UniProtKB/Swiss-Prot annotation:
Sorted UniProt keywords: Toxin
Name of the protein in its database record: MSDIN-like toxin proprotein 4
Protein purpose: Probable toxin that belongs to the MSDIN-like toxin family responsible for a large number of food poisoning cases and deaths.
GO MF annotations in UniProt: toxin activity
Propeptide part(s) removed at maturation, as residue ranges: 1-10, 21-34
PTM annotation, UniProt: Processed by the macrocyclase-peptidase enzyme POPB to yield a toxic cyclic decapeptide. POPB first removes 10 residues from the N-terminus. Conformational trapping of the remaining peptide forces the enzyme to release this intermediate rather than proceed to macrocyclization. The enzyme rebinds the remaining peptide in a different conformation and catalyzes macrocyclization of the N-terminal 10 residues.
Cross-link Cyclopeptide (Leu-Pro) per UniProt, renumbered positions: L11-P20
Family label: Belongs to the MSDIN fungal toxin family.
Amino acid sequence: MSDINTARLPLFLPPVRMPPCVGDDIEMVLTRGE
């Protein structure tokens, strides 16, 4: 995961409250979007 995605992930959902499946989905969307 790139630094940009790492910085943007917390803006979508707090990592502590983010289920793994949701985290993977967001990461996939961001990676595909970039």
